[in-house]
Amino acid sequence: MAANILVIHGPNLNLLGRREPAVYGQTTLEDINRNLTVKAQAAPVALSIFQSNAEHELIDRVQGAMSDGTDFIIINPAALTHTSIALRDALAATSLPFVEIHLSNVYARESFRRTSYFSDIAVGVISGLGAAGYELALQFALTR
């Protein structure tokens, strides 16, 4: 079981619940984080949560996972999914297992959203299950 799990939320996820609720749902990022924290405490595992709209801050946090005891990463790269080779390289450099999360079904949206720089190096991808995708990723991490 992964004892130290890092959850990373990418750009614009701080707007969840207000930004395009028909696409991303009514659940706020605070709701998601609170729910994950409760589940992690019950497990019990250490859970760290980080959100940034800045690519370099996300990269710095991923690189930090190499030396802070992180065992597993749950990441929603958001729009960086389709653009950030640098974030992909940081994840690859850690050699840590990670699950890629998307709240919406990226395959049912615009064609550019169907390209991910992360999926081929992730241990799994969860797409289109809304906030429940985070819970499923945490449940999976707890079995690793």
UniProtKB/Swiss-Prot annotation:
SUPFAM superfamilies: Type II 3-dehydroquinate dehydratase. Substrate binds at N76, H82, D89, L103, S104, R113. CDD domains: DHQase_II. The record marks R19 as: Transition state stabilizer. It catalyses: 3-dehydroquinate = 3-dehydroshikimate + H2O. GO terms for biological process: amino acid biosynthetic process; aromatic amino acid family biosynthetic process; chorismate biosynthetic process; quinate catabolic process. Its EC number is 4.2.1.10. One of its GO terms (molecular function) is 3-dehydroquinate dehydratase activity. Keywords: Amino-acid biosynthesis, Aromatic amino acid biosynthesis, Lyase. HAMAP family: AroQ (MF_00169). Homododecamer. NCBIfam families: aroQ (TIGR01088), PRK05395.1-1 (NF003804), PRK05395.1-2 (NF003805), PRK05395.1-3 (NF003806), PRK05395.1-4 (NF003807). Catalyzes a trans-dehydration via an enolate intermediate. Belongs to the type-II 3-dehydroquinase family. This is 3-dehydroquinate dehydratase. It comes from Nitrosomonas europaea (strain ATCC 19718 / CIP 103999 / KCTC 2705 / NBRC 14298).
